[in-house]
Amino acid sequence: MNAHEIKKLFPVLDQEVNGSPLVYLDSAATSQKPIAVIEALDDYYRRYNSNVHRGVHTLGTLATDGYEGAREKIRRFIHASSTEEIIFTRGTTTAINLVAASYGRANLGEGDEIVITPMEHHSNIIPWQQVAKATGATLTYLPLQKDGTIKIEDVEKTISEKTKIVAIMHVSNVLGTINPVKEIAEIAHRHGAIMLVDGAQSAPHMKIDVQELGCDFFAFSGHKMAGPTGIGVLYGKKAHLEKMEPVEFGGEMIDFVGLYDSTWKELPWKFEGGTPIIAGAIGLGAAIDFLEDIGLDEIEKHEHELAQYALDRLSELEGMTVYGPQKRAGLVTFNIEDVHPHDVATVLDADGIAVRAGHHCAQPLMKWLDVTATARASFYLYNTKEDIDALAKGLEKTKEYFGHVF
């Protein structure tokens, strides 16, 4: 793949910020959108904007075909066995909350355990905290190695017959750690537990086969994978979803409504109450077409090369601390000695370089790292080695500036 040519397909990247060419290194927060996705959204709103499912008119049929067609694209993209297993949500957060509120509250009780890790995004911690309080279950944390990885031996020791749910991110949004979720799922199932995978940072960057991974649930967002904001996906095994109750009620998800009772539609629609995110789903479908045309294997390889190049370039700079393992996904999180991450990001932004600074919705991990915040550069298919060179130059400038200040 040619990242320089791919970059030309993303209009927002063709601009100057503060007098310098934009270098966008914040795709772990949200990705930019290619022309193909922008045009798909524009086409929907210009040509066949309508509500879905019940309309017999032409626009309604076109909108329904686009919406349900996107569901099939997603099924194929993650290798689910049926579109009944693909639930549209507002994002990863909503998807995890759905599982916690529906499956969790129905299947957890006093003495049961939920196993997660200290590296989780808040969206995969807080829902389990809440359901644990409501049910009397206990949150148990897998220990991390010094480099922020999980040791399978520790998984074997931690998961027990008390464990009912294991919920782990596939890829850390801070460390870039790629967790062995397939092996963890096998251990969870051996003890009768189910496995949820937070795929927000993996689905955009690598091939996903939920059946190969063996997970019971898999959640991800459209906006991190070249799609629109406000659209996400929950994959769930049909056997689980059929037993789960909806957590949002209203139009679209009902089969029959009486004065005192109601019944629900079949899967997947019983979990999609209200007017659905039609444009978002169509845009996500276009994003999947775009990514598949390039090839997820090629994207993963490209990002791996960028991550290793970034590690090499940052290792040349004195006073830098880089967090996470050597083998990682396409991001680097770091601090400069005696310089606050927000100051780092501000100086970089003055030269048109966009990075993220803060706790990255991972405060327990920041405590584990013994820092309050970090700076993060994250890469996607449109980034190049020249972008990383610009980052390294900007970090050197930052060091020099604050060296003079202090």
Curated annotation (Swiss-Prot):
Pfam families: Aminotran_5
Reactions accelerated catalytically: (sulfur carrier)-H + L-cysteine = (sulfur carrier)-SH + L-alanine
NCBIfam families assigned to the protein according to its UniProt record, in alphabetical order: sufS
Gene for this chain: csd
Function: Catalyzes the removal of elemental sulfur and selenium atoms from L-cysteine, L-cystine, L-selenocysteine, and L-selenocystine to produce L-alanine.
Modified residue annotations for N6-(pyridoxal phosphate)lysine: 224
EC number: 2.8.1.7
GO terms of biological process kind: cysteine metabolic process
GO molecular function annotation: cysteine desulfurase activity; pyridoxal phosphate binding
Active site, per annotation: 361
InterPro entries: Aminotrans_V_dom, Aminotrans_V_PyrdxlP_BS, Cys_dSase_SufS, Cysteine_dSase, PyrdxlP-dep_Trfase, PyrdxlP-dep_Trfase_major, PyrdxlP-dep_Trfase_small
Record's keyword terms, sorted: Pyridoxal phosphate, Transferase
Top-level taxon in the UniProt lineage: Bacteria
Name of the protein: Probable cysteine desulfurase
Statement: the UniProt record of this protein carries the keyword Protein biosynthesis: no
Swiss-Prot/TrEMBL cofactor(s): pyridoxal 5'-phosphate
Similarity-based family: Belongs to the class-V pyridoxal-phosphate-dependent aminotransferase family. Csd subfamily.
